[in-house]
């Protein structure tokens, strides 16, 4: 592992009177840091989907463009799996900004004439972007685990999870604004979001801290007196990547069940997300501004949808998450079918996209 990514060493404890105010301040600070940082990742994740209608106009085949955009998802899945182990052995303060920096720089290159010159170059750059995107979630999860205790983590995680919808919602309007400012669809869809993402890199690095112990604070379990089952001092020892991978990932059957189920959800989520711009432009005749706001609606609707899903599963179905998921998925299938077969007006298009976004996340 690169030495500069190693977790910061534990520091001696601060004086007792400083621990509580420092802990409270840093908990808010690191949460804002990973929220803004992860939202920044989504400014440079799906830009290619917004560019596809223009690439089709340039003469590129839609099927080949589909192959190119699939590289992003393939690389993202592999990276999230493999880089998660690397992240567990790295400083979150460095790992998250590094991945966002590499994603933004690759997005800048993708927006150049050379980057968009062939399907091969687009495939390679999309693969790299997907790989670097896999460096966003794992360090955020590391921060959540170290700074928030077991019985508060669910609420904090659900709030933080909104970050990717915020970033995903902003990319559509941002592309429209960038195109209006710079007079180029390449600038609107690639360069402008990438430059903003690089600014977010600085903010994330300044705000995020790796662990409480690296700041002279006790473990979060000790601070809040909130210990998970079988907790011991050994729980705070940094494991090797091999131990994490073989002991806690490969042998976890429930994790595999969830992963397989999630793969089918992603077929719909990214199928709509990746192809909506091309579909709306070619079939519905939307311009970039209308596409941008449709994109915004899809992502933004996920925020209340996610919150309502949690409330429904907790309060109505008493923690039986599978029932809530089944209801949501049946409703998704209905609205996707309506969107595909019966949506004939911009209003109906918007209603369907909002409903799908509300339900799919």
Ranges and model annotations:
Residues 48-50, 252-307:
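Extracytoplasmic gate region of multi-pass secondary transporters
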Residues 80-91, 307-318:
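Helix-to-loop junctions at the C-terminal end of transmembrane segments
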Residues 89-100, 315-329:
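Cytoplasmic membrane-interface "Motif A"-like loop-to-helix N-cap segments
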Residues 160-213:
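Helix-loop-helix hairpin linking two adjacent transmembrane segments in secondary transporters
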Residues 101-116, 330-344:
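C-terminal ends and interior cores of transmembrane alpha-helices
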Residues 46, 73-81, 168-169, 299-307:
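Residue-level signature of mid-helix packing/kink "hotspots" within the transmembrane helices
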Residues 319-361:
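C-terminal transmembrane helical hairpin of 12-TM major facilitator-type secondary transporters
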Residues 125-165:
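Cytoplasmic helix-loop-helix junction between adjacent transmembrane helices
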């Amino acid at each position: 592992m690169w030495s500069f990514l190693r977790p910061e060493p534990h520091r001696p404890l601060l004086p007792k009177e400083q621990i509580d105010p420092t802990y409270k301040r840093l908990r808010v600070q690191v949460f804002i840091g990973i929220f803004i940082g992860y939202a920044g990742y989504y400014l440079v994740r799906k830009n290619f989907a917004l560019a596809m209608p223009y690439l089709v106009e340039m003469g590129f085949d839609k099927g080949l463009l589909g192959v190119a955009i699939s590289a992003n998802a393939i690389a993202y899945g592999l990276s999230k799996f493999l880089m998660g182990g690397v992240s567990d052995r790295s400083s979150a303060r460095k790992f998250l900004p590094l991945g966002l920096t590499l994603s933004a720089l690759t997005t800048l290159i993708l927006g150049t004439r050379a980057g968009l010159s062939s399907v091969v170059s687009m495939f390679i750059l999309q693969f790299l972007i997907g790989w670097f995107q896999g460096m966003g979630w794992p360090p955020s999860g590391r921060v959540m685990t170290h700074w928030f205790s077991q019985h508060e983590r669910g609420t904090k995680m659900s709030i933080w999870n909104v970050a990717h919808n915020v970033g995903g919602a902003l990319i559509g309007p941002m592309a429209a604004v960038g195109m209006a400012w710079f007079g180029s669809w390449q600038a609107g869809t690639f360069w402008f979001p990438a430059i903003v993402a690089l600014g977010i890199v600085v903010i994330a690095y300044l705000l995020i801290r790796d662990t409480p112990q690296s700041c002279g604070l006790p473990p979060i379990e000790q601070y809040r007196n909130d210990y998970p089952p079988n907790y011991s001092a050994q729980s705070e020892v940094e494991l090797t990547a091999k131990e994490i991978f073989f002991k806690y990932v490969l042998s976890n059957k429930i994790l595999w069940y969830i992963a397989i189920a999630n793969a089918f959800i992603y077929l719909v989520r990214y199928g709509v997300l990746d192809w909506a711009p091309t579909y709306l432009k070619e079939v519905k005749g939307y311009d970039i501004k209308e596409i941008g706001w449709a994109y915004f609606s899809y992502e933004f609707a996920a925020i209340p949808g996610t919150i309502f899903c949690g409330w429904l599963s907790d309060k109505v179905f008493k923690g039986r998450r599978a029932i809530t998921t089944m209801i949501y998925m049946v409703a998704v299938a209905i609205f996707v079918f309506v969107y595909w077969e019966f949506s004939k007006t911009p209003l109906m298009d918007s209603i369907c996209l909002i409903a799908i976004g509300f339900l799919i996340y």
